[in-house]
A protein has these predicted regions:
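General marker for long, soluble alpha-helical cores
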Residues: 1-237
Length: 237
């Protein structure tokens, strides 16, 4: 900790990686800010995991970009939670998919909202399934529509219930057609009312049969006429 920031910056990467975890934790935030991208990129996974939450929050966005997938995967849940929205926003997709489910759940809702569409689309189905309902609600509509059909199907019923009417109304016809029957049954009546004619027309017969009576009752007449004959026949008596 007695090293000046100038001395820290002067450390060669081979010398920096030789530091023990206690020595790494002894670096103050000014030292962390001063580290070059080459120095940060050279840190071992053990050193990364040893960083304090204050040190993690002090990493510059360029330094986050310099981290590899294995380094990002070494972050603890506390470290992930300490990341700023600016830091989360620059994480490369190849590194984002390296995060474990616990790490994904540690992302704050503000961080989820800060993610770009490409980042959200890169999430694996396992990561999507691990999201909390609060995180799912925090997804911006433009990011939600970037999800592939497998990712949409990975949302659990609690997530579907938690979706806002704006989010449901923004789903593409392809995404709507990919919903499981359990997900369809979990849609709230206000969400069903938010669906447009083209979205309702995308429902499969199995999905139509899975609708609850409350959901059917929430359909607008203009949307009902968009439903195909097979879908109408699938409605339970």
């Amino acid at each position: 900790a007695a090293l000046t920031t100038a001395q820290v910056v002067a450390l060669e990467t081979r010398d920096l990686v030789a530091l023990g975890t206690a020595a790494v934790r002894a670096l103050n935030t000014a030292d962390i800010v001063a580290l070059t991208t080459a120095q940060v990129g050279a840190l071992t996974t053990t050193q990364i995991a040893a960083l304090t939450t204050g040190q993690v929050a002090a990493l510059e966005t360029a330094d986050l970009v310099a981290l590899g997938s294995s380094q990002l995967a070494a972050f603890t849940t506390a470290q992930i939670a300490a990341l700023t929205t600016a830091q989360v926003g620059v994480i490369e997709t190849r590194d984002l998919v390296a995060l474990g489910t616990a790490a994904v759940r540690a992302l704050e809702t503000a961080d989820i909202a800060a993610l770009g569409s490409a980042q959200v689309a890169a999430f694996t189905t396992t990561q999507i399934a691990a999201l909390t309902t609060a995180q799912v609600v925090a997804l911006e509509t433009r990011d939600l529509v970037a999800l592939g059909t497998a990712a949409v199907r990975a949302l659990n019923t609690a997530d579907i219930v938690a979706l806002t009417t704006s989010q449901v109304g923004a789903l593409t016809t392809t995404q709507v057609a990919a919903l499981t029957t359990s997900q369809i049954a979990a849609l709230e009546t206000t969400d069903v009312a938010a669906l447009g004619s083209s979205q309702l027309a995308a429902f499969t017969t199995a999905q139509s049969a899975a609708r609850t009576t409350s959901e059917v009752g929430a359909l607008d007449t203009r949307d009902l006429v968009a439903v195909g004959t097979a879908a109408v026949r699938a409605l339970e008596t």
